[in-house]
Amino acid sequence: FPFKWRRLSFLLNHIGLFVALIAATLGNADMQRLKMTTRMGSAEWRATDDKGQLIELPLAIELKDFTIDEYPPKLMLIDNETGRTLPEKSPEHVLLEEGVIKGTLQDWQLTIEQSIPMAASVATEDTLKFTEFHSMGATYAVYLKAVNQKNQTTKEGWVSCGSFLFPYKAIRLDSLTSLVMPEREPQRFASEVKIYTQEGTITEGTIEVNRPMEIEGWKIYQLSYDETKGRWSDVSVFELVRDPWLPFVYAGIIMMMAGAVCLFVSAQKRKEEDKA
């Protein structure tokens, strides 16, 4: 009886390894990796390969909505001549989380007097100010006062990271440094899609980075978006991957796992026989 278990584990391990290796090798040759660019409100069934050739697919993706969760904006100092953040080796920043009204950057004490998460810039006769703007292209803006702790120099004004619709706004603190708000960094971005197949099925779902959708042998990954528009992007780029040999790779791995279980059972039986 123990001999049968050992024999079975040997066969499962070696056959499983053989199947997994052969399938992985063939899959590497037959794998399709395509890139598809979709636009809000329209279905797309064409994608390009790594050579730029256009390929028609047996499925179509319609982008219903695109959302981005962003990290809170930051305030930083830059060198007026080089544009580099300061200090150069270890740049400092003030993170404008909810409720933050004060911060320090090197010798400058900052006091936030007004924050507008959805803002638009408005040009006046002698300056640029920001007002609430709850529509596409809105940007983040703060009105602040900066006081130099060494010489008591005071500067105040609007600072904004800007958007594809409105320019960024910085404050020139002195001849050497300026206070800026870099572009906000994406924390999470996702696409709500509707997928159509030739068989007539319609599947709705959400695709995120590292959370692909799988349909008819295709894995659909969130790749990128229109970074010039940021959170207002109406374009989403997907990577579609198809490996026809992947089920065989999994089958080989399962066989090896089963072989390991058989080996464990065989060892347990042998211990029981030795005790007897």
Q: Where do the PLM segments sit?
A:
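Solvent-exposed, non-transmembrane regions of integral membrane proteins
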Residues: 1-276
